[in-house]
Design a protein with these regions (language model features):
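Glycine-/charge-enriched secondary-structure boundary and capping motifs
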Residues: 2-7, 11-15, 20-21, 29-37, ...
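Short, low-complexity N-terminal leaders and the immediately following helix N-cap/first helix
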Residues: 30-52
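A generic structural signal for residues located within well-ordered alpha-helices
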Residues: 40, 44, 112, 221, ...
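Glycine-rich phosphate/pyrophosphate-binding loop regions near the starts of catalytic domains
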Residues: 43, 54-216
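Buried hydrophobic packing segments
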Residues: 48, 52, 74, 120-121, ...
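Short, acidic (Asp/Glu-rich) active-site segment that either coordinates a divalent metal cofactor
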Residues: 93, 184, 197-250, 287
Length: 376
């Protein structure tokens, strides 16, 4: 058997033979690939994704290694610069849910990415973590260059505001799975916290105060019920302005999920580290999210009259004849984040952060109680 190594034609030889600069193999110009005929246009996908790098690069810092397009995003955290001695990584993954339907209907896609990033940022912030990096997932029947650019722009803007690097993602074409003009959007975030600063609910005790931070609307939860009531039962249009709402239905439903990261940065800088725990009020509302941070032997008692509930929730509750307690289990009802702090510091912290003391922690069995019972 011959052991002589066979040489492959060099680029120089190839160019000399053909008189042309060699290029990557591709389907003949003017013809359509079999894959494209099946609904997946690889060439279109490559063209669409070619401009992503310029959009996400502003989110990168010295800790990001390499660029976009590799098999994996590379991130080397500088623990020393961050002042972290015993690092704990915190990860979360989420989607935007049926709020996407509003983006489709209004053809407005530049805020939905911020919804996703802010939701994920808040989810890890309640553990005491600060964001490191983010990855996104976008899937559609067919990629629309304009829509994709708007989505990525929103993602990048929110990541930059959160000091979080957008280091990669997946963009998939799935014909037959999604409707024309529709897509799905999800993302994963990883953050970091020093173990001594980890918030896990263990510091919560009877006598603590509950400080509620205001939401600006539905955020990213309860849209299936909201759409059912507003559009099917009440017959409203996106351009309608119901009494008391102050804006159109479409504008109200597209309000960007608020990021509470600036508030957490302020809290971490306070003397004495007053934050005992925090709960992001998302799907499940106050009723299901507060128990996630309550230790055994503690209940959360909420006064639903201690803050002003935004008009949109009243419109949905009355319009759909929804049980008042169910409203507090589906929607945030105007409270997007709850902080657990020492009772004697509750009012001061609430005033400093623009929130309200909405209740307190008492002895109990790990549930949420309302006093008085909420009503529409």
């Amino acid at each position: 058997m011959s052991t002589k190594k066979t040489k492959s034609p060099s680029k120089k030889a190839s160019k000399k033979a053909t008189g042309k600069k060699p290029s990557a193999p591709s389907v003949a110009k003017g013809s359509k690939s079999s894959y494209a005929k099946a609904g997946v246009d690889v060439a279109l996908g490559n063209r669409v994704k070619s401009g992503i790098g310029a959009l996400v690069r502003p989110t990168h810092g010295a800790e990001v290694l390499g660029g976009i397009g590799g098999f994996g995003g590379l991130f080397r955290p500088d623990f020393k610069k961050r002042g972290i001695k015993d690092p704990v990584l915190v990860s979360s993954v989420d989607g935007v849910g049926t709020k996407l339907k509003i983006a489709f209907a209004t053809d407005n896609h530049d805020t939905i990415g911020a919804d996703l990033v802010n939701h994920c940022v808040n989810d890890i912030a309640v553990t005491g973590a600060m964001p490191l990096f983010f990855l996104d997932y976008i899937a559609a029947a067919k990629l629309d260059p304009r829509v994709l650019k708007e989505i990525i722009t929103g993602l990048s803007r929110a990541c930059k505001e959160a000091r979080c690097a957008l280091i990669g993602g997946e963009t998939a074409q799935m014909p037959g799975l999604y409707g024309e003009g529709e897509y799905d959007l999800a993302g994963s975030i990883t953050g970091i916290v020093d173990r001594k600063d980890l918030l896990d609910g263990s510091r919560v005790k009877p006598g603590d105060a509950l400080v509620g931070l205001p939401s600006n609307g539905l955020h990213t939860n309860g849209y299936s019920l909201a759409r059912k009531v507003l559009f099917d039962l009440l017959g409203l249009k996106l351009s309608d302005r119901p009494a008391g709402l102050g804006t159109t239905v479409g504008a109200e439903l597209l309000k960007v999920h608020r990021s509470y990261l600036p508030t957490f940065r302020k809290l971490h800088a306070m003397k004495g580290k007053p934050l005992h725990a925090a709960a992001h009020i998302t799907g499940g509302g106050l009723i299901d999210n507060l128990p996630r941070i309550l230790p055994k032997g503690c209940d959360a008692v909420i006064d639903p009259g201690s803050w002003k509930v935004p008009a949109i929730f009243g419109i949905i509750g009355r319009g759909g004849n929804v049980d008042p307690l169910e409203m507090y289990q589906v929607f945030n009802m105007g409270i997007g984040m709850v902080l657990v702090v020492p009772g004697k510091e509750g009012e001061k912290i609430a005033k400093t952060l623009g929130g309200k003391v909405i209740g307190g922690v008492v002895k109990g069995s790990g549930i949420v109680r309302f006093f008085p019972e909420p009503g529409n």
